[in-house]
């Protein structure tokens, strides 16, 4: 049987040109990130007792560097005063309640006690302090030998480079007397030391 010859393909009937596709709708603008509400000190209800307020005022006055004792502190001192009063806000929280000032405003703008008190109340309500177990668990990650110690050098590096970075001087002050002869730190004793004041 002779091989079949390929049949010539019939040209398909020319279809009418397809209408141009409709232009794609413009992409929707990306959704704006959810804005965190701005802090309004006037909206904060003060729950402190008169004695507590007097104590806070006394501590606040110790930070007052105005020449005439105007009972004002710089924005840059706000976090220090909050921490002196037993609070533990992050730097980001302090900046947020201050209205996110520019770096150059931190030592120029002043804050009086009447403005500071609602900030203190807000921070004290929102504090989520870690427990002893939280801190020990966090340090256990660095316990390579599972022997209850971490290398002092590694802890120094972490404290100075991660999260809310500490200065070298702050790290040295914090770790003073905590290292053994091998440069290791017993982290359970270290956490007890920190939490005791």
From Swiss-Prot:
Residues 1-13, 33-43 have a biased composition (Basic and acidic residues). Residues 1-43 are annotated as: Disordered. SUPFAM superfamilies: EF-hand. The keyword Metal-binding does not apply. The modification N,N-dimethylproline is found at residue 2. The keyword DNA damage does not apply. Residues 56-93, 135-170 form the EF-hand domain. This is Myosin light chain 4. It comes from Sus scrofa (Pig). The lineage of its organism: Eukaryota, Metazoa, Chordata, Craniata, Vertebrata.
């Amino acid at each position: 049987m002779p091989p079949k010859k390929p049949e010539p393909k019939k040209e398909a009937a020319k279809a009418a040109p397809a209408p141009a596709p409709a232009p794609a709708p413009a992409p929707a603008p990306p959704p704006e990130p959810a804005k965190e509400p701005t802090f309004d000190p006037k909206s904060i209800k003060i729950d402190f007792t008169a004695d507590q307020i007097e104590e806070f005022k006394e501590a606040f006055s110790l930070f007052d560097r105005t020449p005439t004792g105007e009972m004002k502190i710089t924005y840059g001192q706000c976090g220090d005063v909050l921490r002196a009063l037993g609070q533990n806000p992050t730097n980001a929280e302090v900046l947020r309640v201050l209205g996110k000032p520019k770096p150059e405003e931190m030592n120029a703008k002043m804050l009086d006690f009447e403005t500071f008190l609602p900030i203190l109340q807000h921070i004290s309500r929102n504090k989520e302090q870690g427990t002893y177990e939280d801190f020990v668990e966090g340090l256990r990650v660095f316990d390579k030998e599972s022997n209850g110690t971490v290398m002092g050098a590694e802890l120094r590096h972490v404290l100075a480079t991660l999260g809310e970075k500490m200065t070298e001087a702050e790290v040295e002050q914090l770790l003073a007397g905590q290292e053994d002869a091998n440069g290791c730190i017993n982290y359970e004793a270290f956490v007890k030391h920190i939490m005791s004041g």
